[in-house]
Amino acid sequence: MSKKNSKNKAGSNTIALNRSARHEYFIEEKIEAGLSLQGWEVKSLRAGKANISEAYVIFRDGEAYLFGSSFLPLQAASSHVVCDPTRTRKLLLSRRELDKLESLIARQGYTVVPLALYWKQCWVKVEIGLVKGKKEHDKREDTKAREWDREKARIMKNKHRG
């Protein structure tokens, strides 16, 4: 059985990406967490109806929750269950990971945001990142570096065409 490495293509394991997080924050550390879901949410994730671009992680009573994500219910979803697309979903992390994240957020000004939502075998996983916010000049430097890398690749491509 071969692994699937494609991102957001047919047959991909990726459900949703938070592209703005890579632009807005310095990503210090990435952690994989499970997600506690209801049945209709799993069905909507299989259909790819998820958005995590405005989401972040909050800590309450020693537990971590994904706040601000939206999973749109399907039209054919069960009518006896009330579907709340923006409900807070519990993250499944070990006690050690929870304590570490909570202490870093409290002391050093870090934030925890979701970076990606994906399938791992039959389970839905969320990749969360321990991040610090970028200043405006940091964003500009990243943009300049990215544009220069593109320009270098373009020059090398034209040079080799010859």
Swiss-Prot record:
Assigned keywords, A-Z: Cytoplasm, RNA-binding
A single MF term (Gene Ontology): RNA binding
Biased composition (Basic and acidic residues): 137-154
GO biological process: trans-translation
InterPro entries: SmpB (IPR023620), SsrA-bd_prot (IPR000037), SsrA-bd_prot_CS (IPR020081)
Presence of the UniProt keyword Cytoplasm in the record: yes
One of the record's GO cellular component terms: cytosol
Localisation per UniProt entry: Cytoplasm
Gene3D superfamilies for the chain: 2.40.280.10
The organism's place on the tree of life at top rank: Bacteria
Keyword hit for Transport: no
Region entry Disordered, spans: 137-162
Pfam families from the UniProt entry: SmpB
PANTHER family: SSRA-BINDING PROTEIN, TMRNA-BINDING COMPONENT OF TRANS-TRANSLATION TAGGING COMPLEX
Described purpose of this protein according to its UniProt entry: Required for rescue of stalled ribosomes mediated by trans-translation. Binds to transfer-messenger RNA (tmRNA), required for stable association of tmRNA with ribosomes. tmRNA and SmpB together mimic tRNA shape, replacing the anticodon stem-loop with SmpB. tmRNA is encoded by the ssrA gene; the 2 termini fold to resemble tRNA(Ala) and it encodes a 'tag peptide', a short internal open reading frame. During trans-translation Ala-aminoacylated tmRNA acts like a tRNA, entering the A-site of stalled ribosomes, displacing the stalled mRNA.
Family: Belongs to the SmpB family.
UniProt protein name: SsrA-binding protein
Lineage: Bacteria, Pseudomonadati, Pseudomonadota, Gammaproteobacteria, Aeromonadales
